[in-house]
Curated annotation (Swiss-Prot):
GO terms for cellular component: photosystem II reaction center; plasma membrane-derived thylakoid membrane. One of the components of the core complex of photosystem II (PSII), required for its stability and/or assembly. PSII is a light-driven water:plastoquinone oxidoreductase that uses light energy to abstract electrons from H(2)O, generating O(2) and a proton gradient subsequently used for ATP formation. It consists of a core antenna complex that captures photons, and an electron transfer chain that converts photonic excitation into a charge separation. NCBIfam families: PRK02655.1 (NF002735). The keyword Transmembrane applies. PANTHER family: PHOTOSYSTEM II REACTION CENTER PROTEIN I (PTHR35772:SF1). This is Photosystem II reaction center protein I. PSII is composed of 1 copy each of membrane proteins PsbA, PsbB, PsbC, PsbD, PsbE, PsbF, PsbH, PsbI, PsbJ, PsbK, PsbL, PsbM, PsbT, PsbX, PsbY, PsbZ, Psb30/Ycf12, peripheral proteins PsbO, CyanoQ (PsbQ), PsbU, PsbV and a large number of cofactors. It forms dimeric complexes. One of its GO terms (biological process) is photosynthesis. The chain crosses the membrane at residues 6-26. The keyword Ion transport does not apply. Belongs to the PsbI family.
Length: 38
């Protein structure tokens, strides 16, 4: 049960890091599709 909890925390942290890095490096000049989603 502890292994499952640790795995869940790792996956959540991984997705949070992906979101933060994508948000910081996703400027409109390099990612024009982001503006269409807003």
């Amino acid at each position: 049960m502890e292994t499952l909890k640790i795995t869940v925390y790792i996956v959540i942290t991984f997705f949070v890091l992906l979101f933060v890095f994508g948000f910081l490096s996703g400027d409109p000049s390099r990612n024009p599709k982001r503006k269409d989603l807003e």
